[in-house]
Curated annotation (Swiss-Prot):
GO terms for molecular function: dipeptidyl-peptidase activity; metal ion binding; phosphatase activity. Expressed in roots, stems and, at lower level, leaves. Probably mediates the hydrolysis of some nucleoside diphosphate derivatives. It is an enzyme of class 3 (hydrolase). The gene is NUDT3. Its cofactor is Mg(2+); Mn(2+). This is Nudix hydrolase 3. Pfam families: NUDIX, Peptidase_M49. Residues 1-14 have a biased composition (Basic and acidic residues). It comes from the Eukaryota. It comes from Arabidopsis thaliana. Residues 30-172 form the Nudix hydrolase domain. The lineage of its organism: Eukaryota, Viridiplantae, Streptophyta, Embryophyta, Tracheophyta.
């Protein structure tokens, strides 16, 4: 039998591209990777230990980790963890049982210098409810002599005293994290945790959003009920897109919401964030795997009479995965890039496109999702472990049902353009071709306004490629829509006059239609802070061919102005300028923000002559840069339109002061969120230029003599970076300015002290009633 080979790593853990036999790796002291799997019993607070065989090369006859093993060359971490547990103990678990809690570097020499172990260990925790009966294990005798359960604190004491019966681990060093994590979950102060969740919830002001349906026919109202049902399915898909165990966590929290006050708070805050990670706390986890769903797995071990089987907690990582559920969690950029280089142009387009998920062949049988398993039966031939699956396949059970609802709704509605949108979107869900349905969305001219499908890419923090599903349903405000025609009509004029070298300007900008709606329902990727407007589609081909359209959510903006911006201005804006903060300026800048998503560089030419897009070149920093661009260029655009006599001069001062107040609103979303990050960049840049002034009473004002030049300067810098596709320059700019500076910290602390809400949490009773 050939000797097992390992991937040789650098001292920092990256693959070198070299693999060597196991014996040579330990002889030469090469860095390599392994997995540690700990089984923790929740009810007894015990860890499962294995007794290493007397024939082992290292630490023979000593008690050790539940299961451990090397990652063979070409294998993945998760697959290795699952395989080692099954081979050594006879325990077979799906991937959602494994929680990767940290990576531990072990550097030691044993056997008189003959065995050098330089090993990066991916440490996994498997949480089970009750002990597995000892007779249910199937031990691999050449590796494991016995197993036993030990209380975790008792085991920690053995290790700290360097008891010779146990394989040594430095519990006062990095490996102490294991025991810290378990202790935090076991020693919960229910009252303190409830108070913490209450404070987090209080940052959202509850609002009810409705609109009059009197102008909709009876058939349109019936269709609306079907559309809301389709929108509910967008929620189901989005939960899946966030993380593989997220749907199970949602169902578990909902089912147990009435068990206690704490359980109700968990559910309430989860429904706002749609995940265990808090949007307003830079995605810090407010739940742990200990709060997650319990799953019964009767076939995980040998069957034992009288024992129903293994029950485990569906795991999720403490740190929000940057690739969400779009990529394998252990995939890095280098692996993706190497795979991409071996694909045809058509395959590359699919892999980097909006509407596909990247998976591993080696983990196909580990996926806990039934619908995914059916999608992996016909894997395309390739030497790579990675492959892509279109949304229309991986989410087919969801999309098939949503498609049926939209098809029926389209049959009912009276508006020809809405009928076309609903029918084309129903087809797109099943074909994965969204171009025609997005054109139909841009051409929509209906009292009932619908946006549904995969659009935004904020959740993909690795590349910014993959789109999440969302829905916005509203009733068009015809008067407000007519009032805003000015902005769409002047989009080309704005593009031609951007503070940007002509070589980077777009030559084919068309007027962007603007629709103003009263929102009556949203779903999918609408977690945390609520959007007040959106500019779609994001597909560069459509932007190039047709431009974009924007939708303004007027009742959402009014709610935010009343509940958030006015109270913020009272605290942060100087007394002399406070009265300049008004809704019209806030609303008008939001319009310009969305308009400016449609101008500036999108499809670009690189120095080597290749055609690309800003999104693909800037990758994970694109979202923050694009939001900053839309904000600051939007402010520039307002002043430009005023100078041209197209807007009233009376709003010059109010638009700048309202923008300043709005900075504090957005930065409170956190610096991991694209809008908050983009706003911090703008605030700190303008403050550095003297355009914003900080006073002794901890309030701010605008220096009207400096603000116009500073806005134009920042607009030029961001637009130029986008025009060049210069990711390095974008990263440097964000790193310099996306910080909480002293004055900014003071303002945020003052807002926290008086408990001004950070955002709103809407409910939609009208839409819910229609659906039911």
């Amino acid at each position: 039998m050939a000797e097992e080979h390992f991937d040789v790593l650098t001292k920092s853990g990256e693959k070198t591209g070299v693999s060597k036999p196991r014996g040579e790796v330990h002889r030469d002291g090469d860095y390599h990777r392994a997995v540690h799997v700990w089984i923790f019993v929740e009810t007894t607070q015990q860890l499962l230990l294995q007794l290493r065989s007397d024939d082992k090369d290292s630490w023979p006859g000593q008690w050790d980790i539940s299961s451990a093993g090397h990652i063979s060359a070409g294998d993945t971490s998760l697959l290795s963890a699952q395989r080692e547990l099954e081979e050594e103990l006879g325990v077979k678990l799906p991937k959602d049982a494994f929680e990767k809690i940290f990576v531990f570097l072990q550097e030691c020499v044993t056997n008189d210098g003959k065995f050098i172990n330089n090993e990066f260990n991916d440490v996994y925790l498997v949480t089970i409810l009750h002990p597995i009966p000892l007779e249910a294990f199937t031990l691999q005798k050449e590796e494991v002599s016995a197993v036993k359960y030990v209380p975790y604190e008792e085991y920690r004491n053995f290790l700290s005293k360097e008891d010779p019966a146990y394989v040594p681990y430095d519990v006062n060093g990095e490996y102490g994290k294991l025991f810290d994590i378990i202790r935090q979950r076991c020693q919960v102060n229910t009252e303190a945790r409830s108070l913490s969740l209450q404070k987090q919830l209080q940052r959202y002001s509850p609002v009810t959003l409705e609109a009059k349906l009197t102008e909709l026919s009876e058939a349109d109202q019936k269709a609306l009920g079907l559309i809301v049902k389709a929108a509910k399915i967008m929620d189901d898909i989005f939960y899946e897109q966030v993380w593989n165990s997220n749907p199970a966590l949602r169902d578990w929290l909902k089912d147990h919401a009435n068990a206690s006050k704490l359980d109700k708070l968990k559910w309430d805050y989860f429904t706002i964030n749609k995940s265990p990670w808090s949007s307003l706390d830079e995605n810090e986890a407010f739940l742990s795997t200990a709060d997650s769903a319990v799953k019964l797995l009767p076939g995980a071990t040998k069957a034992i009479a009288g024992w129903k089987g293994l029950e485990y907690r569906a795991a999720f990582p403490v740190t929000k995965p940057p690739g969400a559920n779009f990529y394998p969690p252990d995939m890095d950029k280098m692996e993706f890039t190497l795979w991409l280089n071996g694909l045809t142009e058509e395959q590359k387009h699919a892999a980097t496109g909006f509407f596909s998920v990247i998976k591993r062949r080696s983990e196909a049988n580990l996926d806990a999702s039934d619908h995914l398993a059916s999608s992996t039966k016909k894997l395309p031939d390739s030497n790579s472990d990675l492959y892509s699956i279109p949304y229309s396949e991986i989410y087919r059970p969801f999309l098939k049902k949503a498609s049926e609802f939209l098809q029926k709704a389209g049959d009912l509605v009276s508006s020809p353009s809405l009928k076309k949108l609903l029918h084309s979107k129903a087809e797109a869900f099943l074909s994965n071709e969204y171009y025609e349905s997005d054109i139909a969305w841009m051409d929509l001219d209906s009292k009932l306004d619908i946006t549904i499908g995969p659009y935004e890419t904020y959740e993909d923090e690795i590349f910014g490629y993959k789109a999440t599903f969302e829905t916005f349903i509203g009733i068009r405000d015809d008067k407000a829509t007519a009032d805003l025609k000015l902005f769409g009509d002047n989009l080309k004029l704005l593009e031609d006059n951007l503070p940007l070298e002509s070589v980077y300007k777009s030559t084919d900008v068309s007027a962007a239609p603007i629709r103003v709606i009263q929102l009556i329902y949203n779903s999918g990727d609408v977690k945390g802070p609520q959007t007040v407007a959106y500019n779609l589609p994001n597909d560069e081909k459509i932007v190039k061919d047709r431009g974009t359209s924007m939708v303004m959510l007027k009742n959402v903006q009014e709610a935010k102005f009343e509940h958030i911006l006015k109270p913020i201005a009272e605290i942060t804006i100087s007394k002399e300028q406070r009265g300049l903060v008004d809704f019209d300026s806030f609303f008008t800048h939001t319009i310009c923000h969305e308009c400016c998503h449609g101008i500036g560089p999108h499809t670009i030419t690189l120095p080597g002559g290749q055609t690309s897009t800003v999104r693909k070149e800037l990758q994970e920093v694109h979202s923050a840069m694009e939001e900053a661009k839309a904000d600051i260029v939007g402010l520039w655009a307002l002043k430009f339109l005023i100078t041209k006599g197209l807007l009233s001069k009376s709003m010059v001062e109010s638009m700048y002061v309202s923008f300043l107040a709005g900075c504090f609103r957005s930065i409170r979303f956190g610096l991991t969120e694209a809008h908050g990050k983009g706003q911090a960049l703008q605030f700190n840049y303008l403050y550095e230029k003297g355009a914003f002034v900080f006073h002794e009473d901890s309030t701010f004002s605008v220096d009207f003599a400096k603000i116009e030049g500073a806005v134009e300067s920042l607009s030029h810098e961001i637009l130029t970076i986008q025009g060049k596709g210069d990711k390095n320059a974008a990263t440097l700019l964000l790193n310099k300015y996306c910080t909480i500076t002293g004055p900014l910290k003071t303002a945020l602390e003052n807002l926290e002290r008086v408990k001004v809400p950070v955002d709103i949490s809407p409910t939609f009773p009208l839409a819910e009633a229609l659906m039911n």
